[in-house]
Amino acid sequence: MKSNSQIKGVSRGFTLIELIVGIVVLSLSFSLLITLILPLSEKSAEQLHQVRASELGQSMMNEILARAFDENSDMAGGLVRCSEGTTDCTSPDENDFPHLGPDDSETRQTFNDVDDYHGYDSDNTDDENALNEKFSSLYPGFRVQVSVCYSEFDGVCNTTSVELAKLIIITVTTPQDFDFVFSFYKANF
């Protein structure tokens, strides 16, 4: 007759069925874990892109608001507004000159009034900031588009006459192709 210690010594290890059940349980737990974590990582990137788009939109808004209302405005103290007296504001008509948009050889670094940003698209240029850092390296995959038009504070662009305010619309597109739209007014004062 064999002792208990001899019987225990013979029955060491796992059976084939126990190994298969262990592999199945492990694979099910990994698949469940991946199913739960993978969507969270995508959401994490989406939230990061939302924050970066907000930063970029706010930065462009601050840059544009720091400019004069119009090319024909008094840029030395703002005592005389365009459309008062003998100075007309820039025409909203694309066929007139000067019209909304950058002047002949202006670049983003030399924009001096709000409507110079009309038609700006970061895909068409690789601008640098004041620290000589390229836009494409600071915000890879992002795109900024700017539209400027005259408006009566109603959110509607007026393309036929000069108004007391310009509506600026900034659209920031993230690498995941989500558009974030920022709109604000610059008044003629």
Labelled PLM ranges:
Residues K2-N4, I34, S41, Q47, ...:
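Short amphipathic alpha-helical leader/targeting segments
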Residues Q6, E46, S137-Y139:
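A general, composition-driven signal for non-globular sequence regions
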Residues F14-Q58:
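Aliphatic-rich helix starts adjacent to a transmembrane/signal segment
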Residues S54-E55, M61-F189:
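Low-complexity, Gly/Pro-rich coil/beta segments used as flexible assembly/activation regions
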Residues M1-F14:
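N-terminal leader/signal peptides at the extreme start of proteins
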